[in-house]
Design a protein with these regions (language model features):
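Amphipathic alpha-helical interaction segments
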Residues: 9, 13, 41, 132-135
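N-terminal positioning helix adjacent to the helix-turn-helix/winged-helix DNA-binding module
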Residues: 3, 38-42, 55, 102, ...
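Alpha-helical linker/hinge and terminal dimerization helices associated
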Residues: 14, 18, 25, 106-122, ...
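Charged, amphipathic alpha-helical coiled-coil/dimerization segments
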Residues: 75-135
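Short, hydrophobic-biased segments on the C-terminal half of alpha helices
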Residues: 56, 74-75
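N-terminal leader segment of winged-helix/HTH proteins
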Residues: 1-33
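C-terminal regulatory/oligomerization modules of transcriptional regulators
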Residues: 1-2, 128-146
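N-terminal helix-turn-helix DNA-binding core of bacterial DNA-binding proteins
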Residues: 23-69
C-alpha cells in the first residue's frame, strides 16, 4: 500500500535533487575556487538590482532567510573578495553591497550554468504547465507566510 501523497515530501525531494544537480554543475568547473549556491544567488540578485542600492535587509526579505544566515554568508563573501560593504551617506547604520570584479566574472559563468539548469528543469513541460507551477508555488508561499 502506497503512503498518501504529501506536497511537503515532494517539495523536499525536489529541493534535494535540485541542490545535488546544482552542486554537480557548479563544482565541475570551479573546483576549490567556486562559490556556494547561496553566494551565487546573492551575486545574481545584486546584478539584477543594480538600478538601486542593495542592503543586507533586502537579502533577508527577498530570500526569506534569517539575519544571522545572511551575515555569515556576506562575511565569507567579503573575506573571499566577492563583495565590499560600503556605508551610505544618508544612514550610518546601512552598508550597501557592491560586487567586486571577481564576483562579476563568476556571475558571467553562472548565467550560462543557470540557463542550462533551467532548461533541464523545463524538459517535457509545456508553457502552460510552467505557468501553472508558478501559480501553485506562489499560493504555497502565501500559505506558509500566513
Amino acid at each position: 500500500m502506497k503512503p498518501p501523497k504529501s506536497i511537503g515530501f515532494e517539495l523536499k525531494t525536489l529541493a534535494n535533487l535540485m541542490k545535488r544537480n546544482l552542486e554537480e554543475c557548479f563544482s565541475e568547473e570551479d573546483g576549490e575556487n567556486g562559490t556556494t549556491g547561496m553566494q551565487g544567488w546573492i551575486i545574481g540578485y545584486v546584478v539584477g538590482n543594480e538600478h538601486r542600492e542593495v542592503f543586507q535587509r533586502d537579502l533577508e526579505k527577498d530570500f526569506n532567510i534569517r539575519r544571522a544566515t545572511v551575515t555569515g554568508v556576506l562575511k565569507l563573501m567579503e573575506r573571499n573578495g566577492l563583495i565590499v560593504r560600503e556605508p551610505v551617506a544618508y544612514d550610518a547604520r546601512l552598508k550597501k553591497i557592491t560586487l567586486t570584479p571577481k564576483a562579476r566574472d563568476i556571475h558571467e559563468k553562472n548565467v550560462q550554468r543557470f540557463i542550462s539548469f533551467e532548461t533541464k528543469l523545463r524538459q517535457g513541460l509545456s508553457d502552460e504547465e510552467v505557468d501553472t507551477f508558478y501559480a501553485i508555488a506562489e499560493k504555497l508561499k502565501k500559505n506558509l507566510e500566513a
